[in-house]
Structures are given as structure tokens and as C-alpha cells.
């Protein structure tokens, strides 16, 4: 059973408490099941959580770090905020507000992928991948265009309350984002009728879930979202990764594939005991996509080794079948699941850390695509 995080006197997670998250539980699982078999441990974990490399290995201090502050020359301010959920706990976040742009501003809420993540969607600061802060970059690009942006620490991460995010189902995560939307609608600086959502990976599935229920959502961006259940994603990842093993016979490859599929089935069989895992395995994004009526931009890297690139078109087609006439798909060449430029795309921790030695920024192509599209649908 996952351990509930300890709280400090003010009800915020202690920065010194290291809790057993989904990562530690799965690490123990793959060791027991011998799922590795020539596969790096980091890749095995990625088969289970599509953006696990972002996971924060330790809690951020309750006092927001200075790196959440904008550059002094930026044409926007950054305000530390607290968003109260319907369950009464507070989510810590940063609200960037443009300067010298007409008010009230259009606004966007950013939605993180799976696994415990801070508001920048960065990993542990001690880990080199911590230099990769995609949500800070997206917030900067949008606020420089006159769009307010709210990004929040996941529940139980950083300065946010709410217990362990690993125990939250996908619909429960959506409720946290809805709290952020309500918060924006109550800000005088924000136009309540011009609010959009941008989500990556699992966050890309949460955005449509909210938009299908809330007609006030003006537009959504889906980054590397899936079009099938978590079970299907896991099986695809295993097949994809096994096919890339070099120096083995077809017979040996089949044996490895069978062993890995058996391990995945065991992992899935335990889903009833872990709320997030159960919702991940069962949730079908296509059923939601059919009911999304607002404008949608779907982005996917053609080197994504976590979610098949074809899923971008599957989502778009389902939305169009449901009557949505404003769905745009853009496949970015040589972009991986992190939306970094990468001609290979295969996931290993070593590969990604080496990649980040050369680039830790989202591509200009991606940032321009997002900011232009959001501006045209919210600000123009």
C-alpha cells in the first residue's frame, strides 16, 4: 500500500519526507518479475508511466523557489497563488499576468502528465533533467503574447496539499484542473469567457475530459495524448521496445516479448489496489473525444516512443465524427515524447540525459505553433 505523505504544521507536505510513490512500487515489481531482461530499468518504468522521467524524486520546499520568477525583462509578472479545490485542500501555482496588454486577459491552464510533477513539469533539481522545464517555457511564450497562464504543482507535490498524487484517479486529477479554471474565472484580470487548456501526455487526455463537460472552455491543446486505454498503450510500448532489441534471434525475441507481456498482465491485475493505475488502465480517451466541441490543436512528435503518432489522427477523426469542425493536427518531425528535437526518440534514461546536455528547451517550432494557435483562438 502506498504511504500517505507526512504534513508540516501548516498542512503542506514536508520537503524532507520521501514517500513511496508509484515509481518505487513499480521498481520493486519489475525486479520481482524479471521484466528487465536486457532492458534498462528506466525504460521499464517508462512502459508503465509514459512520462515517468519527469518524476520529482524529492519534495520541493514550501517556499517557492526563485526559478519560478520571470526574467526581469519579461513583459509579464509571475504571482504565487493558491487554488482551493472542492475538497478543501490548496494547490500551489504560478499565475503569469501580461504587462502592457489590454485587460481582461485570455487565460490558459497547463495540465501535467502522469506521475508526481511540479508546476514546471520538471524533475528533481539534482537530476540533470530538472533543467528541462517545458511548462515554464510555454507560459513564457504565451504571456509574451498577452495571455495569462496558470500552472500548478500536482496535489502532494511541491507546495501543494492533497495527499499522494499516485492515489488520484484521472477524473480526480481533472477536478484539480477544474479548480484552477474556477480560480481564473474569479480573477478580475482574466476574461472568464476566454479560457483554454493545454495538456501533455496524460494531461492531454484530461483536457478533452474537461472540455467535453464544460462549454465555457474556449479551446484546448493536446500534446502527445493517447487514443486508447492504458492497457493498449502498455502493450504497444512493450512490442515497440522489444522489436528494437539488437543481436537476438526471432525465437529469443518472441520469448522476451512473452515474458514482458506476462509481467504487464500481472501489473494490470493489481490495478484494483491502486486508484490511479485502475483509471489509467481502463480510461478510453476516444469516448471523450467524440463529445469535444471546442477548437482543438493536436500535437505529436513523429519520434514519440511512448504514444504512437497515429493516435493524433485517431483523436482528430473521432472529434470530427462527433461534429467538431475546428480540429487541427500537426505532427512535428524529429520530436520525441518530451517534444525535444530528437532523430531517434527511443527512451532510456542515459539517452535522454545525454540529449539534455545539448538541449533542454522545447523547440521554437513547437512554441511558435502553440502560441500562434492559442492567440488566434483566444486573443484575436
Name each model feature, range by range:
Residues 123, 210, 219-291:
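Accessory cap/linker subdomain of secreted extracellular hydrolases
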Amino acid at each position: 500500500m502506498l504511504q500517505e505523505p507526512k504534513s508540516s504544521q501548516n498542512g503542506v507536505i514536508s520537503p524532507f519526507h520521501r514517500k513511496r510513490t508509484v515509481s518505487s512500487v513499480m521498481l520493486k515489481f519489475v525486479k520481482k518479475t524479471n521484466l528487465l531482461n536486457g532492458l534498462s530499468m528506466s525504460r521499464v518504468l517508462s512502459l508503465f508511466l509514459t512520462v515517468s522521467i519527469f518524476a520529482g524524486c524529492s519534495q520541493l520546499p514550501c517556499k517557492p523557489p526563485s526559478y519560478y520568477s520571470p526574467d526581469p525583462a519579461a513583459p509579464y509578472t509571475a504571482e504565487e497563488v493558491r487554488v482551493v479545490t472542492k475538497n478543501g485542500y490548496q494547490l500551489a501555482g504560478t499565475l503569469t499576468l501580461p504587462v502592457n496588454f489590454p485587460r481582461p486577459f485570455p487565460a490558459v491552464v497547463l495540465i501535467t502528465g502522469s506521475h508526481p510533477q511540479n508546476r514546471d513539469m520538471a524533475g528533481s533539481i539534482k537530476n540533470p533533467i530538472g533543467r528541462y522545464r517545458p511548462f515554464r517555457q510555454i507560459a513564457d511564450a504565451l504571456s509574451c503574447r498577452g495571455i495569462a497562464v496558470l500552472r500548478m504543482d500536482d496535489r502532494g507535490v511541491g507546495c501543494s496539499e492533497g495527499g499522494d498524487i499516485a492515489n488520484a484517479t484521472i477524473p480526480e486529477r481533472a477536478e484539480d484542473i477544474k479548480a484552477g479554471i474556477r480560480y481564473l474565472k474569479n480573477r478580475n484580470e482574466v476574461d472568464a469567457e476566454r479560457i483554454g487548456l493545454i495538456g501533455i501526455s496524460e494531461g492531454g487526455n484530461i483536457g478533452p475530459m474537461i472540455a467535453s463537460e464544460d462549454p465555457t472552455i474556449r479551446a484546448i491543446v493536446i500534446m502527445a495524448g493517447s487514443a486508447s486505454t492504458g492497457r493498449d498503450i502498455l502493450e504497444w510500448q512493450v512490442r515497440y521496445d522489444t522489436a528494437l532489441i539488437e543481436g537476438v534471434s526471432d525465437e529469443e525475441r518472441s520469448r522476451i516479448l512473452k515474458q514482458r507481456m506476462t509481467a504487464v498482465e500481472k501489473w494490470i491485475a493489481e490495478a484494483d489496489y491502486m486508484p490511479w493505475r485502475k483509471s489509467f488502465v481502463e480510461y478510453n480517451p476516444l469516448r471523450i473525444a467524440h463529445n469535444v466541441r471546442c477548437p482543438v490543436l493536436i500535437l505529436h512528435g513523429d519520434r514519440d516512443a511512448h504514444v504512437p503518432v497515429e493516435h493524433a489522427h485517431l483523436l482528430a477523426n473521432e472529434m470530427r465524427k462527433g461534429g467538431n469542425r475546428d480540429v487541427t493536427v500537426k505532427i512535428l518531425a524529429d520530436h520525441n515524447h518530451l517534444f525535444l528535437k530528437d532523430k531517434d526518440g527511443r527512451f532510456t534514461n542515459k539517452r535522454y540525459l545525454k540529449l539534455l546536455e545539448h538541449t533542454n528547451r522545447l523547440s521554437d517550432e513547437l512554441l511558435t505553433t502553440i502560441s500562434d494557435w492559442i492567440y488566434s483562438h483566444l486573443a484575436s
